[in-house]
Every structure is written in C-alpha cells, then in structure tokens.
Amino acid sequence: MKGIFGTKVGMTQVFEENGRLIPVTLVRVEPNQVVSVKTKEKDGYDAVQLGFNQTDEKNLNKPQLGHFKKANTNNYKYLEEVRGMVGYKIGDLLKVEELFQEGQVVDVQARTKGRGFTGAIKRWNFKIGSKGHGAGYPHRFQGSVQAGRGGSQAQRVMKGKKMSGHYGNELVTIQNLSIVGFLPEVSSVMISGAIPGANNSKVRITTSKKNPNTVLTYKLIINKKASKPAGEQAQE
C-alpha cells in the first residue's frame, strides 16, 4: 500500500475532449517527509510516519520538537502513519505524482463536517409530522422510541435506536475515486467526485483496497491560454 496526506482546497470541474464533464475535488498535497520508520522486527508492523504542513517551532510542544530534532527533519503540524509502506528511510520526501499515476483508482479518507447536536429529522432523514392541526413545534419530534411493548420486548429503549444526537465529525472513507490529473505548479491533485469535510481539512489518499491495479484514461481539454499570466493573455 502507498499513501500520502494533503488538505482539501475545494471543488471544481474539468472537461474531456468528448465534452464529458467531470466534477473534481482539488487537494493540495505538498511533499510529505518521512519522520519515522516502523519495522515488523522492532514494532510488530511495517509503516512510515509522515509529516506534512510545515509549521513554526512556537506552535509545537517540547516532545514534538524533540521528535523532529531526533529525526533531523522539518517541523510539521501533522504526523500520520501509513501501514504497509516499506523501502523508505527517515528524511525521504514523498511526492504525490511519484507515488500515484494519472487515472489510478484510490481510496480517500477525511473527516466530515461537524454539525453539533442535531434533531432526528436532519440526522436520520425522518419524516416530518403532519402540519394540518397547528400542533406547534412537535411536528419535528422523533415520535415513539418503542419502549415497553410487552411480550418478548424488553422494557427499555433498545441499543442503537435512531434518535437525536451528535451528527458529523466522523472519519469516512470514500472508495474507488480516481486521480484525474496533477497540478505540480500549485502542488495539487485533482480527484474525481466529492470528498467529505470542510475546506483546509486533512485528506488521506491511499492505494485502492478493492481495485489496486485499475488505471483509467482521461483526455482532458487543457486551456493553455488560461495557464499563462494575465499580462501575457492581454498581449495576445
């Protein structure tokens, strides 16, 4: 398995030569540096610890500073592990275009937007109650929780009952997305479809678990004029 980390920039769209529109999520992936290496002999599993998003010393505590000083690497805001990556040593810089290729199918993991304490209608898509008799607010209540029905049913609310509660802020993996293209001039990658989470949130890109060898073909329309500075466009 191969993996790398970045931050979500936002969504846009690109077009293929046949006119097909592809919605893509732009992920900024600066080079990740190997800060620590785990081995099966010493730690029981193979993995690399990657640092990304450089930060100042003032934003880190003493144990973190000591960890980076021992590895003789830059200071990073985030440290994350990727299991199954072997053959790397401390200090190596990993680039997304070197780990993956255009069209490769990948799995993307991110944390969804937190929505706080939410009612059952928004959280579980429950049906709203009838509004025909001016009942006030109870039309948004969740209704019966089916406790104490007698017989074989226990006299309590069953575990896992869909009710109001905390919604969002969950780690979600979206499988079988594909890399549409790379933008090395801005250290970014275009991934097909939507990725959970807010802009500037962490994103983990790994080899697809179900389709590790699948590579798709994209023939994108490249607007060369748009990629030039504004002054050069005006002269043309």
From Swiss-Prot:
Superkingdom of the organism of origin: Bacteria
GO CC annotation: cytosolic large ribosomal subunit
Keywords assigned: Ribonucleoprotein, Ribosomal protein, RNA-binding, rRNA-binding
InterPro entries from the UniProt entry: Ribosomal_uL3, Ribosomal_uL3_bac/org-type, Ribosomal_uL3_CS, Transl_B-barrel_sf
GO term, biological process aspect, one: translation
GO molecular function: rRNA binding; structural constituent of ribosome
Function description: One of the primary rRNA binding proteins, it binds directly near the 3'-end of the 23S rRNA, where it nucleates assembly of the 50S subunit.
Family: Belongs to the universal ribosomal protein uL3 family.
HAMAP family assigned to the protein according to its UniProt record, in alphabetical order: Ribosomal_uL3_B
Self-association and partners: Part of the 50S ribosomal subunit. Forms a cluster with proteins L14 and L19.
Protein name in the entry: Large ribosomal subunit protein uL3
